[in-house]
Curated annotation (Swiss-Prot):
Role: Putative Polycomb group (PcG) protein. PcG proteins maintain the transcriptionally repressive state of genes, probably via a modification of chromatin, rendering it heritably changed in its expressibility. Its association with a chromatin-remodeling complex suggests that it may contribute to prevent expression of genes that trigger the cell into mitosis. Binds to monomethylated and dimethylated 'Lys-20' on histone H4. Binds histone H3 peptides that are monomethylated or dimethylated on 'Lys-4', 'Lys-9' or 'Lys-27'.
Quaternary organization: Part of the E2F6.com-1 complex in G0 phase composed of E2F6, MGA, MAX, TFDP1, CBX3, BAT8, EUHMTASE1, RING1, RNF2, MBLR, BAT8 and YAF2.
Provenance organism: Pongo abelii (Sumatran orangutan)
UniProt cross-references to InterPro entries, sorted A to Z: Mbt (IPR004092), MBT_L3MBTL2_rpt1 (IPR047356), MBT_L3MBTL2_rpt2 (IPR047357), PcG_chromatin_remod_factors (IPR050548), Znf_FCS (IPR012313), Znf_FCS_sf (IPR038603)
Molecular function, one GO term: histone H4K20me2 reader activity
Biased composition (Basic residues): 619-634
Protein name: Lethal(3)malignant brain tumor-like protein 2
Record location of the Glycyl lysine isopeptide (Lys-Gly) (interchain with G-Cter in SUMO2) cross-link: K405, K647, K659, K675, K700
Keywords: Chromatin regulator, Isopeptide bond, Metal-binding, Nucleus, Phosphoprotein, Repeat, Transcription, Transcription regulation, Ubl conjugation, Zinc, Zinc-finger
Pfam assignment, any one: MBT
GO terms classed as biological process: negative regulation of DNA-templated transcription
Length: 705
């Protein structure tokens, strides 16, 4: 039996040049990662390499789909509903689409550029194989075809730096203006919701492996050496993706504790430094505290736990999303929620999609998560009977932002599937009454009516007493949605019900209302009222989308828990802007998610100096599509306005006035407060946290010069 290489050995197949690269770039393709896995006795690298070669051969023979189709469930049909078109995957860029929309007779590529790039790379691979004396294969493999050649560090740190077209900073630009979650949590003794509560975020089903007392190797920031050195730290506290760490040797001294996001590449399992020839150096502050650091670490590490060896690999795997720029879909029309519009995916960040309406302007966009019930595949509206705004033919489409971005339609199985419904034994009928979350004011649960029954279990619901009489405020809910409830739900759960116009909340009675309107309530058995053990508790902190301005993600608190329904309060804002969301909503995220994905996080609102603004300028502010403008709570601290502020929101009159006159008196000055913007899906199978491989040979004693 062949002896596995020890941590000091370097496999002979690896060229020496590999060691001269930046060792902090943990994953630089499977070749550079082979020595890491083999050194710890893991066969995952060789398995990945062998399986990758086997998959390539099978793909060439037409037996396996390209990687994006691995996201499909085993029972996924091979044809699209209603159209009969088969799904296809571009062999160059990996984009998923339909065969009829793909290029060439073979339908192997999504565009001419991909076809040419594939051909060029195939020739290079064939020439390289001949130079190396390898036998020719039936089809030369494409060089650098997949995104796996990207470094894991670059992937986690900079998923597109700079700004989006709407001015939203991303990547490193977002992190520079980031909100300090650690200080905020520690100063106020807040508790963050665990990552395991959010089923749509990376590694949600493996976060139980991250526990208090766990040991990791992190960058030593308290050292004066020319090269980057590391030291071992213990997890003192967990808060979402962030952990509070303490260097070994400080023991009970918390003065040098620091927060870190476990998604960064400077946090590693124990043994990583020994494998990668990195030096362990104690912090300069305590370097003289012990004379035998090796013995001290041996005692501290024995029996402890650390991160799984493949932690960062699985993190990257779980942050790959099937939606790509250029995919077309149907999304709710934000100007008229009773219909949908055609849109094109412009940006994908952490599973969140920035959509551009096809017939809109360059800033006519809409943000949502890829699991949002607001988006659907092309043809969905026609199939279920939902209204859709037909795109107008524009003569200047060459200058439209979606021009040259439309590659293919997003296939149906990329969208979150809804629960199957059975209409036998009675179903929803037009005119039935129920309670529903108001889509235009998400903090209210209102008396509502089923206005129309669509196909596939979808319903058009309207709020009783709404301002619209033409049906423009109808909203589409699926029968299994957790945003609709049977009559008396609010009464049974002590939630304030918003009655129709002309009724008082204190005196509203369902029996009298049904009798007066000569209607009947929808049977309770038709509603989806199951409640999982979600783990959310009152007071937990998280990051939540402001659904009235869905491009913004804000610091928020779980204000109330009613079964699976959560009342989300945005820190610093008045309670009238609270929102009801489901515990499995894709619009809530754990602490540190924005930092992990490079998305901008809105901090709690603080007082800012009033900015004089001419009345006529104030009236030009873009009107919000949904809901009311936010009224600010008088804060105790002040903070200067940061450069990242965009789209200021007008503050309401603190005495209760909600509207600003469109024709202000000459000479009046309107004070404007600006809402600050600060930058800061299923996962692989769960792996148990391994015992520590105690290896502390490379410990260097640092001395003061």
């Amino acid at each position: 039996m062949e002896k596995p290489p020890s941590i000091e050995e370097t496999p002979s197949s690896e060229p020496m040049e590999e060691e001269e690269d930046d060792d902090l770039e943990l994953f630089g393709g499977y070749d550079s990662f082979r020595s890491y896995n083999s050194s710890v006795g893991s066969e995952s690298s060789s398995y990945l390499e062998e399986s990758s070669e086997a998959e390539n051969e099978d793909r060439e023979a037409g037996e396996l789909p390209t990687s994006p189709l691995h996201l499909l469930s085993p029972g996924t049909p091979r044809s699209l509903d209603g159209s009969g078109s088969e799904p296809a995957v571009c062999e160059m860029c990996g984009i998923v689409g339909t065969r009829e929309a793909f290029f060439s007779k073979t339908k192997r590529f999504c565009s001419v550029s991909c076809s040419r790039s594939y051909s060029s790379n195939s020739k290079k691979a064939s020439i390289l194989a001949r130079l190396q004396g390898k036998p020719p294969t039936k089809k030369a493999k494409v060089l650098h075809k997949a995104a796996w050649s990207a470094k894991i560090g670059a992937f986690l740190h900079s998923q597109g730096t700079g700004q989006l077209a709407d001015g939203t900073p991303t990547g490193q630009d977002a992190l520079v203006l980031g909100f300090d979650w650690g200080k905020f949590l520690k100063d106020h003794s807040y508790k963050a919701a665990p990552v395991s509560c959010f089923k749509h975020v990376p590694l949600y089903d493996q976060w139980e492996d991250v526990m208090k007392g766990m040991k990791v190797e992190v960058l030593n920031s308290d050292a004066v050496l020319p090269s980057r050195v590391y030291w071992i730290a213990s997890v003192i506290q967990t808060a979402g993706y962030r952990v509070l760490l303490r260097y070994e040797g400080f023991e009970n001294d918390a003065s040098h504790d620091f927060w870190c996001n476990l998604g960064t590449v400077d946090v590693h399992p124990i043994g990583w430094c020994a494998i990668n020839s990195k030096i362990l150096v104690p912090p300069r502050t305590i370097h003289a505290k012990f004379t035998d650091w090796k013995g001290y670490l041996m005692k501290r590490l024995v029996g402890s736990r650390t991160l799984p060896v493949d932690f960062h690999i699985k993190m990257v795997e779980s942050m790959k999303y099937p939606f790509r720029q250029g995919m077309r879909l149907e999304v709710v029309d934000k100007s008229q929620v009773s219909r949908t519009r055609m849109a094109v995916v412009d940006t994908v960040i952490g599973g969140r999609l920035r959509l551009l309406y096809e017939d809109g302007d360059s800033d006519d966009d809409f943000w949502c998560h890829m699991w949002s019930p607001l988006i659907h595949p092309v043809g969905w509206s026609r199939r279920v009977g939902h209204g859709i705004k037909m795109s107008e033919r524009r003569s200047d489409m060459a200058h439209h932002p979606t021009f040259r971005k439309i590659y293919c339609d997003a296939v149906p199985y990329l969208f979150k599937k809804v629960r199957a419904v059975y209409t036998e034994g009675g179903w929803f009928e037009e005119g039935m009454k129920l309670e529903a979350i108001d889509p235009l004011n998400l903090g209210n649960i209102c008396v509502a009516t089923v206005c129309k029954v669509l196909l596939d279990g979808y319903l058009m619901v309207c709020v009783d007493g709404g301002p619209s009489t033409d049906g423009s405020d109808w909203f589409c809910y699926h029968a299994s949605s957790h945003a609709i409830f049977p009559a008396t739900f609010c009464q049974k759960n002590d939630i304030e019900l918003t009655p129709p116009k002309g009724y008082e909340a204190q005196t509203f009675n369902w029996e009298n209302y049904l009798e007066k309107t000569k209607s009947k309530a929808a049977p309770s058995r038709l509603f989806n009222m199951d409640c999982p053990n979600h783990g959310f508790k009152v007071g937990m902190k998280l990051e939540a989308v402001d659904l009235m301005e869905p491009r913004l993600i804000c610091v928020a608190t779980v204000k109330r828990v009613v079964h699976r329904l959560l009342s989300i309060h945005f820190d610093g804002w008045d309670s009238e802007y609270d929102q009801w969301v489901d515990c499995e909503s894709p619009d809530i995220y754990p602490v540190g998610w924005c930092e992990l994905t490079g998305y901008q996080l809105q901090p709690p609102v603080a007082a800012e100096p009033a900015t004089p603004l001419k009345a006529k300028e104030a009236t030009k502010k873009k009107k919000k599509q949904f809901g009311k403008k936010r009224k600010r709570i008088p804060p105790t601290k002040t903070r200067p306005l940061r450069q990242g502020s965009k789209k200021p929101l007008l503050e309401d009159d603190p005495q209760g006035a909600r509207k600003i006159s469109s024709e202000p008196v000459r000479g009046d000055i309107i004070a404007v407060r600006v809402k600050e913007e600060h930058l800061d899906v299923p996962s692989p199978n769960k792996a148990s946290s391994p015992e520590l491989p105690v290896s502390v040979e490379n410990i260097k004693q640092e001395t003061d010069d």
